[in-house]
Each structure stands twice: as C-alpha cells, then as structure tokens.
C-alpha cells in the first residue's frame, strides 16, 4: 500500500498519471469531458487523453509543504513564472519589398475648386433656397400632401438639381473680415471709456481754475469752515456735504456742465451747417418774411445742385416764391450775426473795428503773436481740461 506501483490504481485520487498529490481531485475516468465510458474504463487506456509531457517533471516542493504541483509552479515552468525577468528583443520589421514593384504612392489630389466647383458654391443660403424651389419640393412632398403622386423622371430630377446648383451662392465669410469687424468696435469702446474718464475730470479741473481766481498767488482754502464746525482745512473743490461751501461747489459744477453742453451744441450746429444739413436762411435785404421749404414749390429754382436741402423760399410782395441757395459754410454764424444786428443796433459799430483789425500791418500781427507766445503757458493751463473733447469733435467732423 505504501510503495509506489507502476500499475495505475482506480479510485479517487489514485491515478498517478495525473498530478494529484493531495488526493482530493476526482478521478478523470468519471468525467464525460474526457470521453470515459464502459469501453475505456481507465484513464490510462483512453486513446483520446492528453499525455501532459510536463507531468513527469517534478518541481521543488512537489510533495512537501510548498504544495507545488509536479509540473512546475502555479504559473508554469517559464522564467517569468519562476520569478526571473528576461528581456525578449523585439523582432525587427520586415523589409519593404514594394519599392520597385507593387503599390505605388498615391499622387496628390487636385484642389476641390477644380474637381467639384459646385461644392464651392453651396452653402446654407442656397440649400434653403433649393428646398423652397417647387421642383425640389415636388420630389419629397407630392401634390395634395399624400404619399401618392407622380414623381418626375430621374433624368429630369438630375437636370433640375444641377441647374439649381449651378447658381452662384453667397460668398463664404472671410475670418479676417470678421476679426477686423469685431476689433473695430472693441477699440472704439476702449477709446470711448478712456475719453469718458478724462471728460469726468473736466468739471473738477475747471472748478479748481475757477476757485484759484479768488486766491491769486496762494493756496485755495475753503472759506465755509469756521471755529464752530468740526471740519479740517480742505480745498474748496472737495467740500464734504456738511461743509457750508458744499452747495457753492455743486452750483459751480452745474454751471460748468451747462457750459460744456452749450459748447458741444454749438459745435454740432456748426458741423451740421458745414455739411449742408441745417436749412438756415439768411436775411435778404428788402424781404419782410422768410420761410423754409422744398425748392419744387418755387417759381425760380436755386442755383446749383446738392443732395442736401440747400435752398430757402422767400415771399416778396408780388406773391411769387423765389428760392435762394443756402451758403455751404458759416451760415449759422451769419444768421446769428444778422439776427443780432437787427435787434441790437450797436453791434453794427463793431464792423469798422473788425475791418480795421483785419487790415493792420504785419508789425501789429507780430506783436499779437508775441503776446500769445508770452501768455501761451497760462492759456494752456486754462484750456488743457478741454483737450479730451478735441478727439470727439474730430470724429464727429469726419463721420457726420
């Protein structure tokens, strides 16, 4: 019983041809997968068995405490299973043999605009226009809305769609134009924000200049503070709300804002008049009333042609309407001067003085230039707050 016998023994765990040292694996002859039957009752006599050549290799600890199967470790007899790492060199790729024969490299394809010109003309606009075409809609939506209907022949369909695709669609949008179109408004917003911050400093600068006129040669100090008020010494342009001079500061800045708005309004009126968009009619000697209106109501047309309304209609005593052209420039100033001369007769006395000043000698003009040079820095300090308004006036002059 204890010795080894070459004769296979039957029973559970007694087939020594199969590694079963622990003796708890069932006998293979009972397993239908190995085709055990009454004709082949023994595993060793089964012609369809797997001989397992590695079964005869006895590993370390096969029958000892390590419980290592005789055919090697739990992972097999390979060096990796035994814990030895070996580097297997990768096989080099096979040499190419199609250099001289076989498949040749694919040549470069011609541009799409040459091979498929209709694809360059197709976009979403022409696609929707094609769908709205009655001939195309008849292909998918027969008459009456039902599935029954007469479909055009295939050759007519192809010719119809080809004729529609041959139409030139809208040009493809250029990304450069889109980028430049977005960059322009961003630069305008940045410049506008910068000018706005500068314009907001104009009232404070003009307020400082206004208050400095009362403190020539000294530091402006608010006169509203007294011994009873617990207010520290401060500038009259930065009065707190509890200071008695606060209301005067607000009044000065309100007047300054009105002056700035009046200046902008005058510039806008002069600009509109320069563009011929301001129908100001000058007073004509001998005419009692004037009225503005289209030139087609006049019996005598105005001289010259213009795309802007450039004529005034007068009504003399005979009842006929006569049109006169509006001056292209300085009509507003001329109108104001004539209007003021009619109501204030003493302004006519200034005309000879202006004419005399214009006819002065060059020596007088040089003296005036010298005075401007001498008073230039002071004038610059006065006019410097208005410098941010110059770019705005320039943009209005160019784009209006």
From Swiss-Prot:
Q: Which residues are glycosylated?
A: 320
Q: What is known of its domains?
A: The large envelope protein is synthesized with the pre-S region at the cytosolic side of the endoplasmic reticulum and, hence will be within the virion after budding. Therefore the pre-S region is not N-glycosylated. Later a post-translational translocation of N-terminal pre-S and TM1 domains occur in about 50% of proteins at the virion surface. These molecules change their topology by an unknown mechanism, resulting in exposure of pre-S region at virion surface.
Q: Which residues lie on this side of the membrane: Virion surface?
A: 2-181, 275-348, 399-400
Q: How is it used?
A: Systematic vaccination of individuals at risk of exposure to the virus has been the main method of controlling the morbidity and mortality associated with hepatitis B. The first hepatitis B vaccine was manufactured by the purification and inactivation of HBsAg obtained from the plasma of chronic hepatitis B virus carriers. The vaccine is now produced by recombinant DNA techniques and expression of the S isoform in yeast cells. The pre-S region do not seem to induce strong enough antigenic response.
- The segment annotated Pre-S1 runs over 2-119
Which stretches of sequence are listed as region Pre-S2? 120-174
The protein in question is named Large envelope protein
Q: Where in the cell is it found?
A: Virion membrane
**The organism sits in which domain of life?**
Viruses
- The scientific name of the source species is Hepatitis B virus genotype B2 (isolate Vietnam/16091/1992)
For bias type Polar residues, the affected ranges are: 96-106
Its quaternary organisation is:
Interacts (via its myristoylated pre-S1 region) with the host SLC10A1/NTCP; this interaction is essential for viral entry.
Q: What PTM annotation applies here? A: Isoform M is N-terminally acetylated by host at a ratio of 90%, and N-glycosylated by host at the pre-S2 region.
Q: Which residues cross the membrane?
A: 182-202, 254-274, 349-369, 376-398
What this chain does, per the entry, is described as:
The large envelope protein exists in two topological conformations, one which is termed 'external' or Le-HBsAg and the other 'internal' or Li-HBsAg. In its external conformation the protein attaches the virus to cell receptors and thereby initiating infection. This interaction determines the species specificity and liver tropism. This attachment induces virion internalization predominantly through caveolin-mediated endocytosis. The large envelope protein also assures fusion between virion membrane and endosomal membrane. The middle envelope protein plays an important role in the budding of the virion. It is involved in the induction of budding in a nucleocapsid independent way. In this process the majority of envelope proteins bud to form subviral lipoprotein particles of 22 nm of diameter that do not contain a nucleocapsid.
Segments on the Intravirion face: 2-253, 203-253, 370-375
Its main localization is virion
Q: Which gene encodes it?
A: S
Residues carrying lipid (N-myristoyl glycine): 2
Residue ranges for the region (Disordered) are 1-51, 85-115
Locate the region Pre-S.
2-174
